[in-house]
Curated annotation (Swiss-Prot):
<comment type="similarity">
    <text>Belongs to the CRP1/MDG1 family.</text>
</comment>
<feature type="region of interest" description="X-DNA-binding">
    <location>
        <begin position="160"/>
        <end position="161"/>
    </location>
</feature>
<dbReference type="InterPro" id="IPR032640">
    <property type="entry name" value="AMPK1_CBM"/>
</dbReference>
<dbReference type="GO" id="GO:0005634">
    <property type="term" value="C:nucleus"/>
</dbReference>
<keyword id="KW-0238">DNA-binding</keyword>
<dbReference type="InterPro" id="IPR050827">
    <property type="entry name" value="CRP1_MDG1_kinase"/>
</dbReference>
<keyword id="KW-0597">Phosphoprotein</keyword>
<feature type="modified residue" description="Phosphothreonine">
    <location>
        <position position="182"/>
    </location>
</feature>
<dbReference type="GO" id="GO:0005737">
    <property type="term" value="C:cytoplasm"/>
</dbReference>
<feature type="region of interest" description="Disordered">
    <location>
        <begin position="247"/>
        <end position="276"/>
    </location>
</feature>
<dbReference type="Pfam" id="PF16561">
    <property type="entry name" value="AMPK1_CBM"/>
</dbReference>
<dbReference type="GO" id="GO:0019901">
    <property type="term" value="F:protein kinase binding"/>
</dbReference>
<feature type="compositionally biased region" description="Basic residues">
    <location>
        <begin position="127"/>
        <end position="151"/>
    </location>
</feature>
<feature type="modified residue" description="Phosphoserine">
    <location>
        <position position="319"/>
    </location>
</feature>
<feature type="compositionally biased region" description="Basic and acidic residues">
    <location>
        <begin position="404"/>
        <end position="428"/>
    </location>
</feature>
<feature type="region of interest" description="Disordered">
    <location>
        <begin position="300"/>
        <end position="465"/>
    </location>
</feature>
<dbReference type="GO" id="GO:0071944">
    <property type="term" value="C:cell periphery"/>
</dbReference>
Amino acid sequence: MSSELMFNYTFSWPAGPKDVILTGTFDDWRGTLPLVKTAKGNFEITMPVKLANKDDTFQFKFIVDGVWCVSDSYKKEHVSEGIENNFLQITDLVETQEVAGASRIPEAGGLLCGKPPRSAGPPSTSNRKKNKRNNKKRRSKLKKKSTKNNKKSNESLDDNEEEDGVTGTTTEDVTGTSREETPLAEPTNVSKEAPGNFHILPIDQSADTTQSNGIIGGPGPVLVPNPGEIKEFTEIRDVDARELNERLNKKEEVPEPVAGPIVESSVTEKSPALPQADDPIVETKEVAHNVQELTPQVEAVTPLINEPEPLPTPEAQISIPESSKVEPVEGSLQSKLVEKRESTEGVLDGSKKVENKAKKDEEVFTLDPIVNKAPKLPLTDEQTAEGRKSPAVSEEKEKKKKQEKGSKEVKRSETSKEKKPSAKEVKKQTVKAPKKQTASPLSSSTEEPKKKKTGFFGKLKKLFK
């Protein structure tokens, strides 16, 4: 048997420093055992102390915030060369006995964990009195609760009996639900079980080990029953990516130039087979062109048809018969009037040409069946000269037209109830009246019928015919 002696001893240091470390002969003065700071602020640690003999001592020292120092609460010993250490003897260790039933905490440096030793002697009378009072209060509360519960249970039983009498059942058939009637669970003997044994679920050895549990470990690998029949497991091919891309790109580029000329040749071959346009198609185009030219003139005249014609002003009535009588005018004014007359004659000539074209189109393009008519012979020079030299005939026709016009205007004046003329008509009359006076005395006799035919009233006569 070994002669070593071992005791548990608690080393302490008062509160104040941040870190306290214990070192000594047990660790060859390396400073490896730090003290634990308690709730009070002091530092403590409990550790086993070994002694070889009864006369042997345990030498130690404290390192407080990096400074080696000795505690005054322990015995001191002077070593050679002026070094001072704390030490413990066997008598100091025997006084501190270990608590029965306590266990050590290795994380806390060997501190004890257990109930403190109970002090000898009887307990105090004050504690007994307090315990008795508390017990009496608890009993009284329990009695009150029990009486309330009994009353409620009796009332509920009476109600149940009344209901049973109505429905034909008794309370004997009903099972009790109170705590007293519930059976207790059978106690299990824990001592019979071995400390190291655990409950393990039974394993079905007949199941295939290849199949995996889908609930715990997921779906797992799939094992095919016939892997030899699947091509993907046996066939392996090595494909060069560059060669494959070059081959595919060449195939895509080849059809582009070939597809172009084939389409063009088919179009060029089929183009002469199209039917040529007939003559009536060309004529319809010309008619549409002429209609577009006449539309602005028709739009300018339509508002005059809808509106009732006002009574002619006295200025207009006087200017029409007196157009032939022109007084001599000075040279400067006469030149200006001649220029204006030429500009108006150009406009009137253009309107005549448009009207002649419209008449020709109406005569040529009709829906009636075409009959071969004798072509009109062109007029000779003599006939044209006779037409020009007979202004008297044209004057007689104009007088008849004026008389008819006067009768129509009188009828319209009665219906219109003396309505005033619009601003547009007054402007047209005032502008066109001096045009007839600007004619020179030499050419007045020959050009009077042309002006009257193309005047404002001449257009109105054509529309009312």
